[in-house]
Amino acid sequence: MKDAQLNTFCQRHQAVLINSASNSITVAVVDAPSHALLDALHFATQKQIDIVCWTRQQMENHRHKPDQAPSANAAKGGETAAQLLNQTLRSAMAKRASDIHLEPGASRYRIRLRIDGVLHILQDIAKETGLALTARLKVLGNLDIAEHRLPQDGQFTVDLMGDSISFRIATLPCKEGEKVVLRLLHQVEQTLDLDTLGMYGAQLTAFRQALQQPQGLVLVTGPTGSGKTVTLYSALQTRNTPGINLCSVEDPIEIPLDGINQTQIHPRAGLTFQNVLRALLRQDPDIIMVGEIRDGDTAEIAIKAAQTGHLVLSTLHTNSTSETLIRLQQMGVARWMISSALTLVVAQRLVRKLCPHCKQRLSDPVVLSPNLWPSALPRWQASGCQHCYHGFYGRTALFEVLTVTPTLRQLIASGASAQALEAHLQQTGTGTLFENGCRAVEQGMTSFEEILRVLGMPHER
């Protein structure tokens, strides 16, 4: 179809053809294109179709111009959106970002990158460019471009820097427009090895011993984004041999692994954690991994599996090892079941590592109460350099490991308070998260300010 015909065709659908190149066309619409327009355009031309969202005032201004022929200058918004998207994705990859946030404001859009768990501003862009970028992302993610009132989720893959990179897109209607978050699904090959997790001697020994048991429940706890998944998969890999039947139920399957029978739940189809767990017990499993214990039913099935000759690994959203014991009781699991099945609890957090190229030790130390840490801690500063951009490069995990001893089993079964459980942990555990964080500060791995950001200041004992 010729450009003149395309222009007339677009006008019938209250749209404007603003650019036509050899392999693409750019069409401007008010707010968002209709399904009828998109379907008709795909039928009329084989070229790539780029949509630019204009305000009603922009459309009126365009219609009153004496020359309305498609031009390269008029298509600047569409070209800018395409170029900006490519630049943003490249910046995210170069800076090791895990997420990209596109946030609408009253007059401008803000783009932020989450790097090592912290958001950093990349740039602000014009409102029109932000709208065009949002529309382009929704088309890439196969979302309903005309829907602005409801959240949407999708996924797309692009060729970037010589690799095929996948992104998960999620939109959310906000006061000033649609907020878009992209999650980079591209992951660098990661060695799933217990020795590389960051546990020190006593913690690693306790973890290995629990994983070699023929049965029992091992829980890894912490908030979202604390590294639980890598710890869990590393644990599975230590037992991944031809003589063992490893099964998992996950939402979603985050790291595909050879040798493990991985099942992803599908609640809409009736495939829930509970249903899959019951089915797995009829699959002659040796070790079962449950991606997350979300409710009492799942917890009870997992514990029963751990009591009947299976080693069960799972995660729970709690802040510490002692809190995990209380949370299971709050879920409705009987105390005797917890005390008989639970063998080990690991709590963890991720902290940013100081950049080795620009970190400096300052003269004034950090002095804490002796009840919290007995000696002065070095104070570190990293101002940022060409290697790290912000003073930190990468993250490492802090761990708190609690082995369930016979004494602790009695405390759980008798309904001991959180304070009593915490006191027992202080006497027999391998150190709290805060104590192990202070150890990392002593070693120059991270700063005390970073420990406070992630853990906060604990109460004195």
Positions of PLM-derived features:
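Polyanionic, low-complexity intrinsically disordered segments
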Residues: M1-F43, Q152-M161, I165-A170
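Core recognition of P-loop NTPase motor domains used across DNA-transaction enzymes
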Residues: T8-Q11, A15-I18, A36, A40, ...
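Short, flexible helix-loop junctions that flank or precede catalytic/ligand sites
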Residues: C10, G78-S91, K95-R461
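Short alpha-helical interface patches
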Residues: Q11-V16, A21, T45-Q46, I51-Q68, ...
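A short, compositionally biased micro-patch
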Residues: S20-A21, A44, G105, Q213
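Short, basic, glycine/proline-bearing loop/turn elements
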Residues: N23-I25, A69-A75, L192-D193, N261-T263
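Short glycine/Trp-rich loop-beta-loop segment that forms part of the substrate-binding cleft
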Residues: T26-N61, G198-R208
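Charged, low-hydrophobicity low-complexity segments
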Residues: F43, D50-R90, K95
